[in-house]
């Protein structure tokens, strides 16, 4: 079976924009004669919609978007992740819709909800109670959300698709490769894992959608921190021939993630410029370098705010950094403002020895100005 794997950068709450991306990928896949196209968990709503899921009009809009997407699937089948409200019973599932012949014909619900870190799915969703394979072109397609549902894999399954979204950590790609290789060998099945790519405020998705053959060998890996589109043939996965992205060391990977996350966050929120304080220290230097790489040095303003505690060396280091990066910079002396704070607080501080409380007023002053 020819399967299209689009790896897309969705936006939380942007149902129309996400749907347009999905439809565009479907049209591309149909033009390339793909038989099935895969989209991850909550592709229509965007990852982490959170309290938007408490608004019935939002969930209904997601359902209408799924129907609009289905209408474009005239020559291809699709698996699309979206919230699914059972209005009759007043419950909602995290579902994978199966689309064929221009309409939704089947689907599965996520059975093991994620409730860790930033995930609180049981607050919004009800867990599904079973998992039945999708029947398509005389093949049984098992749709799972993550490896915790692997107990549903059956010997009659033709291949397995994981549509769960995997947040980025420095070790997430390595761990995912290990898990998929182990499961592929254990169950003797070809496995496909499709992921989100993009930033969601405090969470980053790195893409890295993967395909493993039944021998536990990686057959395909999509790009990290970038949209991508790949076609695979499940009949030709026995001997992997597809090129995969070159792995990087941890520092290089973290650097790439930070630059991508900053750039994507600014783009999604309509920001173009940033103002950063430059102290001459390593912390502000690293932040400035990352911001300049992500946004362009001309879009990052460096603000030097020396005080009576600033050394000439730190001021010169901050100036050298700004000039080396090529970023515009300004200097605002904060001594006068700092002294006004001290004067205002003197009635409270007069009987106390001078300590870090007074020194830290300079940090508060800088924060106010930035």
Where are these regions (language model features)?
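Short glycine/serine/threonine-rich phosphate/pyrophosphate-binding segments
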Residues: 284-287, 311-312
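A generic structural signal for residues located within well-ordered alpha-helices
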Residues: 17, 250, 357, 361-365
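Enzyme catalytic cores with a strong preference for nitrogen-chemistry domains
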Residues: 1-277, 290-297, 304, 324, ...
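A glycine-rich phosphate-binding loop feature that marks nucleotide/adenosyl-phosphate handling sites
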Residues: 271-284, 337-338
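Conserved glycosyltransferase catalytic-site signature
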Residues: 177, 364-367
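A conserved beta-strand->alpha-helix junction
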Residues: 112, 226-233, 299-304, 312-355, ...
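Acidic active-site catalytic centers that drive phospho-/nucleotidyl reactions
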Residues: 41, 279-283, 366
């Amino acid at each position: 079976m020819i399967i299209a794997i689009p790896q897309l950068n969705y936006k939380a709450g942007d149902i129309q924009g996400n749907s347009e991306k999905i439809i565009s990928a479907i049209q591309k896949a149909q033009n390339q004669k793909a038989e099935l196209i895969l989209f991850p968990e909550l592709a229509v709503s965007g990852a982490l919609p959170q309290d938007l899921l408490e608004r019935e009009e939002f969930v209904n809009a997601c359902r209408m978007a799924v129907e609009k997407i289905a209408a474009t699937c005239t020559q291809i089948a699709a698996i699309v992740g979206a919230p699914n409200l059972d209005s009759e019973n007043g419950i909602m599932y995290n579902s994978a819709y199966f689309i064929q012949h221009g309409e939704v014909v089947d689907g599965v619900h996520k059975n093991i909800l994620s409730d860790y870190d930033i995930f609180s799915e049981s607050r919004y969703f009800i867990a599904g109670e079973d998992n039945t394979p999708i029947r398509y072109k005389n093949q049984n397609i098992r749709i799972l959300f993550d490896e915790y549902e692997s107990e549903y894999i059956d010997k009659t399954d033709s291949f397995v698709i994981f549509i769960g979204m995997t947040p980025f950590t420095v070790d997430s790609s390595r761990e995912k490769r290990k898990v998929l290789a182990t499961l592929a060998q254990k169950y003797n099945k070809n496995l496909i894992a499709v992921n989100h790519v993009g930033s969601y405020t405090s969470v980053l998705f790195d893409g890295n959608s993967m395909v493993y053959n039944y021998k536990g060998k990686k057959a395909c890996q999509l790009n990290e921190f970038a949209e991508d589109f790949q076609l695979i043939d499940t009949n030709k996965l026995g001997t992997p021939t597809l090129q995969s992205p070159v792995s990087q060391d941890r520092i290089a990977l973290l650097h790439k993630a930070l630059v991508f996350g900053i750039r994507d966050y600014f783009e999604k929120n309509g920001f173009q410029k940033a103002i950063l304080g430059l102290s001459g220290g390593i912390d502000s230097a690293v932040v400035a370098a990352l911001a300049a790489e992500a946004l362009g040095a001309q879009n990052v303003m460096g603000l030097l705010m020396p005080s009576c505690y600033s050394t000439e060396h730190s001021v010169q280091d901050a100036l050298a950094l700004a000039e080396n990066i090529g970023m515009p910079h300004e200097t605002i002396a904060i001594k006068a403002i700092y002294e006004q704070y001290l004067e205002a607080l003197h009635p409270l501080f007069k009987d106390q020895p001078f300590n870090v409380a007074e020194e830290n007023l300079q940090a508060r002053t800088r924060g106010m100005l930035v």
